[in-house]
Amino acid sequence: METGPRGCPSGRKESQEICSPGLLVFTGCSEQDANLAKQFWLGASMYPTTESQLVLTRGSSQRLPVARNSKVVLREKSSVQPFPFDQDKDAIIFAKAQRIQESEERAKYLQKAKTRDEILQLLRKQREERISKELISLPYKPKDKVPKSKEVLSESGLRDQEEVKALE
C-alpha cells in the first residue's frame, strides 16, 4: 500500500470528487479497505498538544519585563558582582573535580582492559590444552572409511557398463 502525505485513493470516482488524484494511492487492497483508509486520511488532523499551545492573556507572565532606567541597572550590577577571586576558586574547584573524574574513568578503563587480557589469556590456554589433547588422541581415533554407497553402483549404472562392454 503506497500512501502520500494526504488525500484519498486515486483512480476511483469518489476520490476524484473529494480530493485530487495522485495524492494517496492504495494498490493491492480491497475496495472496503481503501474506503476506510480514505475516511481516515480525510478525517485525520494533526493538532499540536495542549502543552505546546501558548495562551496569551492580558495578565500573562509570558511577556518580557519592561526595561528600567539604565542608571539604576548599572548600580545594581556593580553591587551584585562577585569578587574575581571567587570566580577563580570556582574554576579551580571545577578543574579539580574534572581531573578526579577523568582519573576515575581512566582507572575504570584500565581495569576493564586488564580483565579483558586475563580472559583472552585463559581462552588461549584452554585452546592449547584442547589441541594437545586432540593430538594425543589422534593416533587412537578410527580412520574415516569410504562409504559403501560409492563402491556399489546402482542397477542403471551396471546396465550402462554392460552395454558399453557389449559394444566393444
Curated annotation (Swiss-Prot):
Chief place of localization: cytoplasm
UniProt KW keywords: Cell projection, Cilium biogenesis/degradation, Cytoplasm
Function: Required for motile ciliogenesis and flagellar genesis by mediating the maturation of the glycolytic enzyme ENO4.
Taxon lineage: Eukaryota, Metazoa, Chordata, Craniata, Vertebrata
UniProt family annotation: Belongs to the HOATZ family.
Keyword Cytoplasm carried by entry: yes
Miscellaneous comment: Named Hoatz according to the Hydrocephalus and Oligo-Astheno-Terato-Zoospermia phenotype of Hoatz knockout mice.
This protein's name: Cilia- and flagella-associated protein HOATZ
Location of the region described as Disordered in the Swiss-Prot/TrEMBL record: 142-168
Subcellular location: Cytoplasm; Cell projection, Cilium
Disrupted-gene phenotype: Male mice exhibit severe defects in spermatogenesis, leading to infertility and varying degrees of hydrocephalus. The epididymal ependymal cilia frequently show disorganized axonemes, reducing motility. Mutant testis shown lack of fully developed flagella in the lumen of the seminiferous tubules; the mutant spermatids elongate but do not maintain the axoneme, leading to severe destruction of the flagella. In contrast, the ultrastructures of motile cilia in the tracheal epithelia are intact.
Cellular component terms per the entry's GO annotation: cilium; cytoplasm
Tissue occurrence: Specifically expressed in tissues with motile cilia and flagella, such as brain ependyma, lung, testis, and oviduct but not in whole brain, liver,kidney, spleen, and eyeball.
An example Gene Ontology biological process: axoneme assembly
